[in-house]
């Protein structure tokens, strides 16, 4: 588990360096953005779906349940026996699976790949998806703007600083031509796939350990 965590830390640094090289420093283009790249915003490249108020979707007596993904679960990376539960019959778009990109936009702001198994999406969390663009692209750009979002939330008068949808619209993204998009995707996509696979493996190992340890004692 420790080794996988160290590998993932290294992979995350590599991914950020590649992103910066192409999208911030324009190193492959002698420091100048190519003319055929477009400028857009986060809402142009992805959908940000806010979760449900899950207390309204408790399971009925004879219904199967799902754990609820809240900010606490996102931070710790898994659901546990203290997590709330919801009906498994909620709309499918609110059901989260391994590898989904989740953006906590209220309170503790963070964006991450969820690798803690199937669960229901609570309010104050966005599920980030796109029909047009790949996961590496919308994850990287949301991550890129995260520090700015944290500063905006901090400056709010309320204790629960949060990000409004208009802030997503104000957040600029650069959209490469299809050739460059494929090239960058070939570099970043495998890195993020590996990070997700390592996290899922860590969860499996931890569950195995927790099952076996009591039997060995």
Residue ranges of each PLM-predicted region?
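Structured core elements
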Residues: 68-70, 102-103, 127, 172, ...
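Sequence-specific dsDNA recognition surfaces
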Residues: 40-58, 65-98, 120-121
């Amino acid at each position: 588990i420790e080794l996988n965590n160290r590998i993932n830390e290294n992979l995350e640094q590599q991914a950020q360096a590649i992103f910066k090289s192409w999208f911030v420093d324009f190193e492959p283009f002698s420091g100048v953005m190519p003319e055929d790249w477009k400028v857009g915003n986060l809402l142009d490249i992805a959908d940000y779906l806010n979760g449900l108020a899950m207390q309204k979707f408790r399971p009925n007596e004879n219904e199967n349940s799902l754990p609820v993904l809240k900010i606490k679960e996102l931070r710790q990376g898994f659901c546990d026996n203290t997590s709330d539960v919801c009906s498994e019959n909620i709309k499918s778009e609110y059901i989260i699976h391994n590898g989904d990109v989740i953006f906590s936009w209220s309170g503790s702001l963070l964006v991450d790949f969820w690798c803690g198994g199937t669960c229901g999406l609570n309010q104050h969390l966005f599920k980030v998806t796109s029909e047009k663009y790949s996961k590496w692209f919308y994850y990287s750009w949301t991550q890129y703007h995260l520090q700015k979002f944290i500063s905006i939330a901090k400056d709010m008068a309320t204790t629960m600083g949060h990000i409004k949808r208009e802030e997503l619209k104000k957040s600029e993204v650069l959209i490469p031509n299809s050739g460059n998009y494929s090239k960058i995707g070939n570099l970043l996509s495998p890195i993020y796939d590996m990070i997700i696979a390592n996290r899922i493996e860590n969860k499996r190992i931890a569950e195995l350990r927790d099952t076996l340890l009591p039997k060995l004692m």
